[in-house]
Design a protein with these regions (language model features):
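Conserved short strand/loop->alpha-helix "switch" segment adjacent to the catalytic nucleotide/phosphoryl-transfer site
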Residues: 7, 11, 33-54
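Short beta-to-alpha transition helix within the HATPase_c
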Residues: 11-29
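Glycine-rich/acidic phosphate-handling loop/turn and adjacent ATP-lid/helix
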Residues: 63, 67, 86-118
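Short beta-strand/loop element within the Bergerat-fold HATPase_c
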Residues: 71-86
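Glycine-rich nucleotide-binding loop
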Residues: 98, 140-147
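Short alpha-helical Gxxx[C/S/T] motif in the catalytic ATP-binding
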Residues: 120-124
Length: 155
């Protein structure tokens, strides 16, 4: 059994496991991974949606950070989740160097096999829409941000 140095306590066991797994990938790739999530009021979100939302946004952030070869640029992922005005707000920011093309709040992939790419964010949006939430995407030269808003109307 692999030793787990980092203990996450988001109040959701599945999310804690996902975060621990992603943290170990970040550690192997010298990516600073900061997490601050309180999931206490969000246990109405179903397990497949927790997996879809968090795995996809973190995987995308890791992929963008791995592309950074310039050692003067810190590879960094900041993931926060908190309740603001009866909304669970998830915000993931990561450093990047690759150009991100946005069209109608959708990421246009730069990958050659585009058929299979872009599915991650589509999965995130599909999961978020089940809870009447929405997703906002922002990209500038060196930072990508995805913000998710999920109303707390189910508890």
């Amino acid at each position: 059994i692999k030793e787990c140095n980092t203990i996450f306590n988001t109040q959701n066991m599945i999310l804690d496991v996902i975060l621990s797994d992603k943290k170990s990938i970040c550690d192997m790739n010298n990516i600073y991974f900061l997490v601050d999530i309180n999931f206490l009021e969000c246990n109405f979100i179903e397990m497949p949606d927790i997996c879809s939302i968090f795995s996809n946004i973190i995987d995308n952030a890791i992929e963008a950070c791995i592309k950074i070869k310039d050692t003067s640029i810190q590879k960094k992922i900041k993931l926060r989740g908190t309740v603001i005005n009866r909304l669970f707000v998830i915000k993931c920011e990561n450093t990047k160097i690759n150009e991100v093309v946005l069209k109608n709040n959708k990421v246009i992939t730069s990958k050659k096999d585009s058929f299979l790419h872009g599915i991650g964010i589509s999965s995130v949006k599909s999961s978020v829409e089940k809870y009447n939430g929405n997703v906002e995407i922002y990209s500038d030269k060196n930072k990508f941000t995805i913000t998710i808003y999920i109303p707390l109307t189910r508890n």
